[in-house]
């Protein structure tokens, strides 16, 4: 049943249930022969859609384009290792942009991060555009918030790397209002442990 579970439980989805009449399933899945689990795990897949409008080309005479990358993180399995509080690269990027946005107008071009649904993202990248006259203030705030985040995660992510690179290109960007919505969603997305078991010490119940 867990064939291809790393990318969406494809084995379970392909199961022919037409001859199954039972209403309950006992899970005995384990990676070690002779060992049975006494509990099981499940997940909910949510898809969030927001109206962003069309992107328009930035002007090299007006905007400066930057690439922000978050990397060097440990990542890990979002079920097995979620209690270790490893940093989520997408959330780190969201926190960074949220902080900077309080001081500078940011237009988002593209944001990518993560690869598997059940893995803690260890890399994320954003392409953004800033009004060129705000570039010095933007770079200053980037350094300030990067230092804050590195301090916050230094105990669990000693190799965290948050990098900024100026790109001599034009980019298709979302409006300022749409960009604020994108950054808001990144900042508000729930991440990490929500509840620990009250019956089994040290076991994550919900994350």
Identify the function of each model-found stretch.
Residues 1-56, 109, 201, 205:
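Acidic/histidine-rich catalytic neighborhood of metal-dependent amide-processing enzymes
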